[in-house]
């Protein structure tokens, strides 16, 4: 049995607990909060379910113990540097770190990779939402002057998005000042954004989200190949399930001495599922 611990017990951590309990090849090795000591942690792999900007600190501590880590780091422009930062310590201590292991980045990254292999020439559009972005919501809540927040992603076509950020202001704070702080954050720097002050964010809070990935391309010199993938999901539930599947993959990689830090596109898909080679080929191929 794979011993899996959870670090961080928010929406993703709670969903991960359920996913681990339903996995036939895993057992829950503990639930840890941000301020808990990790000195005596006993686990094969830890799901780091903390806010993105806290992940590297905890991952470094765990990898130094030879414990594999899974995270859902979601700042797309920083994924490569995040992976490279964790790689040396993982390799030094014989561990595996799978980064950005959610649905996007994560499994959507696999879809985009497969679409590129199918149509080497073309254009891919990833359209998120409408739905609540967990990463952007956490980032908005951390802004000075924000008491509570919800960030909703609105697709506007062609892989472009608008962010509607509903905020409850701290007493005495000015909307324009707080809005400028939000717009200046890396999470929000790349999309049009509306910051809306409300008395309560509860009417706008939801776990629903979705994606439509479309590619128009050329296969074997023939154009007008139309590829698409769509899903509507519960955000924390799916993110947690993917992290649990990546925990399985990390242990299989460690067993074959493939140490280091990786994204989902580095990993053989067969490693994600609780099947042996024969079962996987008979069922999936």
Regions found by a protein language model. Give the residues of each.
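C-terminal substrate-binding/catalytic lobe of Rossmann-fold NAD(P)-dependent oxidoreductases
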Residues: 3, 14-18, 22-40, 131-249
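Glycine-rich Rossmann-fold phosphate-binding loop(s) that bind the pyrophosphate
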Residues: 9-10
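Rossmann-fold NAD(P) dinucleotide-binding segment
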Residues: 45, 52-74
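General beta-strand structural signal in soluble alpha/beta enzymes
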Residues: 71, 97-101, 127, 150-151
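Rossmann-fold NAD(P)-binding glycine/threonine-rich loop
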Residues: 73-97
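Rossmann-like NAD(P)H-binding beta-loop-alpha module
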Residues: 107-127, 136-139
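NAD(P)-dependent Rossmann-like dehydrogenase/reductase catalytic/cofactor-binding core
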Residues: 230-285
């Amino acid at each position: 049995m794979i011993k899996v611990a959870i670090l961080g017990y928010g929406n993703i951590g709670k969903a991960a607990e359920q996913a681990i309990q339903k996995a036939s090849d895993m057992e829950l090795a503990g639930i840890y909060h941000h301020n808990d000591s990790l000195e005596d942690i006993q686990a094969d792999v830890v799901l780091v379910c903390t806010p993105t900007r806290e992940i590297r600190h905890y991952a470094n501590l765990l990898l130094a113990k030879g414990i594999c880590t899974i995270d859902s780091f979601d700042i797309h422009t920083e994924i490569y540097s995040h992976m490279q930062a964790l790689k040396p310590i993982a390799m030094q201590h014989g561990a595996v770190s799978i980064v950005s292991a959610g649905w996007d980045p994560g499994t959507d990254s696999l879809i985009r990779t497969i679409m590129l292999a199918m149509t080497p020439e073309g254009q891919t559009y990833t359209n998120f939402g409408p739905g609540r972005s967990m990463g952007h919501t956490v980032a908005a809540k951390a802004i000075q002057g924000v008491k509570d927040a919800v960030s909703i992603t609105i697709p506007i076509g062609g892989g472009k998005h608008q962010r509607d950020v509903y905020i409850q202001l701290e007493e005495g704070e000015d909307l324009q000042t707080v809005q400028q702080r939000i717009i200046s954050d890396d999470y929000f720097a790349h999309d049009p954004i509306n910051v809306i002050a409300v008395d309560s964010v509860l009417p706008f809070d939801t776990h629903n989200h979705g994606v439509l990935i479309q590619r128009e391309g050329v296969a074997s010199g023939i154009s007008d190949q139309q590829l698409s993938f769509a899903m509507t999901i519960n955000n924390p539930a799916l993110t947690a399930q993917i992290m649990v599947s990546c925990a399985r993959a990390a242990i299989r990689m460690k067993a074959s001495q493939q140490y280091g830090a990786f994204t989902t596109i580095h990993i053989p898909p067969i490693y994600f599922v609780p099947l042996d080679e024969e079962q996987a080929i008979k069922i999936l191929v």
